[in-house]
């Protein structure tokens, strides 16, 4: 078992143009096209009780720029200066919204798949991501998506796209005859309920891999209750089917004292599991896919302390 302590998982949403707007009296129309700068810094300390070892780590140091060039065209560029010590270009895309509720996105970004894998670091509930979000269903790629939102008492958000399958780096000389795809449907029900279904096809190497994911959550009255299941099948029975499950409960307790440095305290608990998993590209000497992540079960409990700052500032203590 591991004791994980995350200190100052901070997200700063900085509207760099706000001060200059006030000084130059720019029109509201001009203000809409000013770029916005956002950032996330997340440091943590982990201690492994069985081995008696510990470490400090800068898990994320993200900077992103978003904005619009015209009302129907927006953009985003995001880089992580320290993803466990490595620099990674994460998002670089342009989005066109020709009519209300319809959008077309092209570039590099996280594919529309799963619930938990789509959360940015500042949106995560725990110090470490679930197995679905980290090992089994975490995919960023280069491609294009089409999205549409149906309004009404139960809004529905649909997304579908085609992708290279090259990942984030092998783009220049990457040509393929088989295109990967992903599709996701979100149903927003009354009283804070949500149902999300998604599917994805990838081909990391010689074998195609199909993934199917279904999840539900309830977010209301300070509670967030969520459960998600992912099934992964390898073409040609190249590897055993993979099953992964994630469920957790979070409850926000608001601090009534307005002068307090703490805005809320959130106890939370999670159970997640996965069977033996292959990334689809690692082979042994006999040409068979190898296990890259062994089966495991995990129970995580802890507390998140949210500080009363102008931006998101959380201290997450997990065991």
Where are the regions that the model predicts?
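N-terminal periplasmic/intermembrane-space "pro-region" immediately following the signal or transit peptide
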Residues: 1-42
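Disordered, low-complexity tails and leader-like regions
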Residues: 14, 159, 305-307
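Outer membrane beta-barrel
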Residues: 26-167, 177-179, 185-194, 248, ...
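Outer-membrane beta-barrel pore domains
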Residues: 49-51, 70, 93-97, 108, ...
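A short secondary-structure junction signal
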Residues: 159, 169-174, 196-198, 208
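Interfacial loop-to-helix transition and helix-capping segments at the boundaries
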Residues: 172-178, 238-242
